Amino acid sequence: MEYNETYFKKSANRKVMLIWVLIASILTIAYGIEYAKGGRELGYVLAFIAICWIPIVLSFIIVKIKGWENSICKETVTIGYGVTYAFALLTANTNISFVYIFPVISMLILYKDRKLIIRSGIYNVLLLIVNVVIRAVQNKITPTDVTDYEIQFACII
């Protein structure tokens, strides 16, 4: 069977969108549970859900207009999930939220686009740096946090 670029793009976009919807669904449920436990305010949870789902809806609109074989989808996934990830990371109550990047990196591998993965990796490292700087300015870094941040950078790089 020879390589068919149109088939590959359709297949990759469908798989990535399915995974993205599954991740967003899990995160929506998790943040809903967090609200129910009193860990987050309703406004925060609604903002998170909007930030999480609006890029997905926009991506499906693009797919409807341009077709499943379009090249724009991988960019909307990367940017959309990147915004969701940034919001979650920078507003998290825990240092473990950096792991939210792993599903998107796994999804992006389906595109077999090295430059896209490198750009995403650089974005992630910059976000981790921004997160550490913000926490340092707020004087919210403990010795345990320093170890956590070292582990985060080691995992990402």
Residue ranges and their predicted role:
Residues 1-10:
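Short, Lys/Arg-rich, polar N-terminal cytosolic tail immediately upstream
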Residues 2-3, 41, 91, 140:
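Secondary-structure junction/capping motif
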Residues 11-12, 71, 116:
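Short alpha-helical segments used as structural interaction elements across diverse proteins
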Residues 15-93, 100-107, 124-129:
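Hydrophobic transmembrane alpha-helices and their membrane-interface boundaries in multi-pass
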Residues 29-51, 110, 114-157:
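Alpha-helical transmembrane segments and their interfaces in multipass membrane proteins
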Residues 90-96, 112-115:
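Transmembrane helix interruption/hinge and helix-loop junction motifs
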Residues 97-98, 119:
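Alpha-helix N-cap/helix-start motif
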